[in-house]
Amino acid sequence: MNKRAALRGIGLLSVAVLSSGILVACSEDKPQFNAIDLTGADYAKDFALADPQGRTRTLADFRGKVVAMFFGYTHCPDFCPTTMAELAQVKQSLGAEGKRLQAIFVTVDPERDTAENLKSYVTAFDPEFVALRPENEQQLSALAKDFKVYYKKVEGKSPGSYTM
């Protein structure tokens, strides 16, 4: 086979692959909504945390929804906003089924994350996302232990600065 025939074959194959990808991307079908039931788990059974309006929220408040809890903090430079944006994209990609997904952002930095900051932060990703804030370090520690979440305050280079 000569070089010209090989290039023509590669070109045709590339066009076929690209065309297939475009057809799949243009499909009106939404991804199927699947969840894992953790009802029998011995962890993450419940919580009682304040939302930005001061109401105590529990897992029962979200009955009938699939709950995606994310532990983070509003001063997080990269991972937290990326994950929240991905949760918003997942919810949007589910179309009408997205109403069944409840994203909950739990701060691991109640020292800096005020109720106002939390509300602004989560609603920037989706107005239906909920932010919750432990009252103090003891409540945060107990919650993290129950949900098997690790967090640690790491002092920064300048006085008073830190990351989680």
How would you describe each model-predicted region?
Residues 38-41:
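Start-of-domain marker
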Residues 138-164:
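Thiol/disulfide oxidoreductase modules built on the thioredoxin-like
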Residues 13-21:
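Bacterial N-terminal signal peptides
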